[in-house]
Swiss-Prot record:
Belongs to the UPF0283 family. The keyword Cell membrane applies. GO terms for cellular component: plasma membrane. NCBIfam families: hyp_HI0043. PANTHER family: UPF0283 MEMBRANE PROTEIN YCJF. Residues 27-36 have a biased composition (Basic and acidic residues). InterPro entries: DUF697, UPF0283. This is UPF0283 membrane protein BOV_0999. Keywords: Cell inner membrane, Cell membrane, Membrane, Transmembrane, Transmembrane helix. It comes from Brucella ovis (strain ATCC 25840 / 63/290 / NCTC 10512). The chain crosses the membrane at residues 78-98, 109-129. It is a multi-pass membrane protein. It is found in: Cell inner membrane.
């Protein structure tokens, strides 16, 4: 027990803190003022900015399309043209000899062969006419691209209206563009700057087609990536990439109203492949791919699945190049799709397959 006397109860008065009104707590907003001493401003680096090397690498990986201008006749055109004439002469002489020989055997055989030859000639002429119309349609799309870019650059209202009318003619048979064409019809009598009219037509008519085109490119890239990941032979990979790329080019051309024939498709495929260096640029773009995916593909995917991503990117680049070629207007108001729009989906698809294994 302690000898100390317990302390008596004592009352204490607590000092109430001064209440600060909510209005006084709010700081008065700073009045806007001009900064005259620029040395006081300290710029900060953006963590999402690419370095110069990475930006150059990404530019090489995903180049914009520039239509090549060909003037005159090349040696290859002269060669194949001459060979085509010789083959035509050979077929004509062979057909004539065959018909004469059949007339010698029996008149009805000769007349039958002559009738069949006339039917074949008429069908051949119809095919040639259809191919020429398709080639002319592709050429008109290329000229329209140049006219639209020139009208937007010069802000020429008359040239812009002419280009927009041509675009409406091309898109007349596409149901997805009906709403945009109706809107442009309502603005026929309005006064709009040439550049704004081009951008408006691109937004209202081509935006739905661009969304569908992105879906086509992404789905084709996914199919190529999956087939590459499960195929046992590299020859199967190459064959399927070629098949899927050819089908993608044709479907994109039909989507934008191109409807190419056989010769038109060959010319279109040549123009698409002309500005692609897929294998080399894909190999150079690993550091950019690492930044976009989040970490290195080699540490995330197996070798076979990594090949699937690369082949999918090859198909995506082919699709982007095809969009550049077959699109009636160049990308101005709308953002041009890039490799970065497809890398994440392809890597996620293949990593999910790797996780299930």
């Amino acid at each position: 027990m302690s000898d100390k006397t317990p302390r008596k109860p004592t009352a204490f008065r607590l000092e109430q803190p001064a209440r600060v009104s909510a209005a006084s707590e709010q700081e008065e907003p700073r009045r806007p003022r001009a900064v005259k001493d620029l040395e006081q401003i300290t710029p900060q680096a953006d963590v999402f900015d690419l370095t110069d090397d990475e930006a150059a690498e990404l530019e090489i990986l995903d180049p914009a399309f520039e239509a090549p201008e060909r003037k005159g006749w090349s040696l290859s055109r002269i060669l194949f043209g001459a060979l085509g004439i010789l083959v035509s002469f050979a077929i004509g002489i062979w057909t004539e000899d065959l018909i004469r020989a059949l007339f010698v055997r029996a008149d009805w055989l000769g007349w039958t062969a002559l009738g069949v030859a006339m039917v074949a000639l008429a069908a051949f002429a119809a095919i040639i006419l259809r191919e020429l119309v398709a080639l002319r349609r592709l050429a008109s799309v290329q000229h329209l691209r140049k006219d639209a870019a020139d009208a937007a650059e010069r802000d020429d209202m008359a040239a812009a209206r002419k280009a927009v009318d041509a675009l409406r003619t091309i898109a007349a048979g596409i149901p997805e563009t009906a709403k945009g064409r109706q809107l442009l019809d309502s603005l026929t009598d309005d006064i709009i700057d040439g550049r704004d009219l081009i951008r408006l037509a691109e937004t209202e008519i081509l935006r739905p087609l661009d969304r569908e085109a992105r879906t086509l490119v992404l789905n084709a890239s996914k199919r190529v990536s999956i087939v590459t990941a499960i195929s046992p032979r590299a020859l199967v990979d190459i064959g399927y990439v070629i098949f899927e790329s050819a089908r993608l080019i044709r479907r994109l051309s039909q989507l934008y109203g191109g409807r190419p024939g056989t010769l038109g498709f060959i010319k279109l495929a040549r123009r698409v492949i002309a500005h692609l260096a897929v294998t080399g640029t894909i190999a150079m773009g690993d550091s950019v791919i690492q930044q976009l995916v989040g970490h290195g593909l080699a540490s995330r995917l197996s070798a076979k699945l990594g090949e699937g991503v690369v082949n999918g990117l090859m198909t995506a680049r082919m699709g982007i190049a095809a969009m550049d070629v077959v699109r009636p207007f160049p990308f101005n108001a709308e953002k041009r799709p890039g490799i970065g729009d497809f890398i994440g989906d392809l890597a996620r698809l293949n990593s999910d397959r790797n996780a299930r294994k």
